[in-house]
Amino acid sequence: MDTWHDALGGEKQQPYFQEILNAVRQERLSGQIIYPPAADVFNAFRLTAFDRVKAVILGQDPYHGAGQAHGLAFSVRQGIRIPPSLLNIYKELETDIEGFSIPAHGCLTAWAEQGVLLLNTVLTVRAGQAHSHALLGWERFTDTVIRQLATHRKHLVFMLWGGYAQQKRKLIDSQNYLILTAPHPSPLSAYRGFFGCRHFSQANSYLSRHGIDPINWKL
């Protein structure tokens, strides 16, 4: 199994998946603003090929502010103010990765292109309404994504930040993967253990031990 089409082609034919796409399409047609734009909803899969995934960082649902979401968890487009959770991720990187300096932007495309799957478990949201698409059925699809990676790939790193992401641990066989958990990088919880977790250097050490090129976290 080498491609996302191999891994997810059957899932995309399931009635529930077609119902999700139709529900989102109907909301857009009715004038509801939905983020990310339709062309960006599956960006995580477009930028990170199935057979090139090295690490998975799980988010919840997309940013719901104008111009922010572009299909990658925690990432925002160039020119958009860096959100607080991402700024805290950068602060942890600054202490964890030698030579990392906090960039002036929040675009994580360079990580995605190196094999970091930046996966939100819910892939769309209404403008200004956090979790508004939480019940559409996206999680059934993204749970399948996690299961397929955990079944058909080896030596991946899963970064699960916060209780919500950590619920997905049950989908992963920990014997063949590195599962890293910490509080969410949100300002509400980062000081409870996200700061100091050193997940980025741990990920690179694990990848190197298994003969996999480490990730250049610098942006």
From Swiss-Prot:
Keyword annotations of the record: Cytoplasm, DNA damage, DNA repair, Hydrolase
GO biological process terms, semicolon-separated: base-excision repair, AP site formation via deaminated base removal
SUPFAM superfamilies per UniProt: Uracil-DNA glycosylase-like (SSF52141)
Record InterPro entries: UDG_fam1 (IPR002043), Ura-DNA_Glyclase_AS (IPR018085), Uracil-DNA_glycosylase-like (IPR005122), Uracil-DNA_glycosylase-like_sf (IPR036895)
Gene Ontology cellular-component annotations: cytoplasm
Keyword Nucleotidyltransferase: no
Catalytic activity: Hydrolyzes single-stranded DNA or mismatched double-stranded DNA and polynucleotides, releasing free uracil
PROSITE patterns on file: U_DNA_GLYCOSYLASE (PS00130)
EC number(s) recorded for this UniProt protein: 3.2.2.27
Compartmental location: Cytoplasm
GO molecular function: uracil DNA N-glycosylase activity
Keyword presence, Membrane: no
Pfam family, one: UDG
Function text: Excises uracil residues from the DNA which can arise as a result of misincorporation of dUMP residues by DNA polymerase or due to deamination of cytosine.
PANTHER family per UniProt: URACIL-DNA GLYCOSYLASE (PTHR11264:SF0)
Protein name: Uracil-DNA glycosylase
Native source organism of the sequence: Neisseria meningitidis serogroup A / serotype 4A (strain DSM 15465 / Z2491)
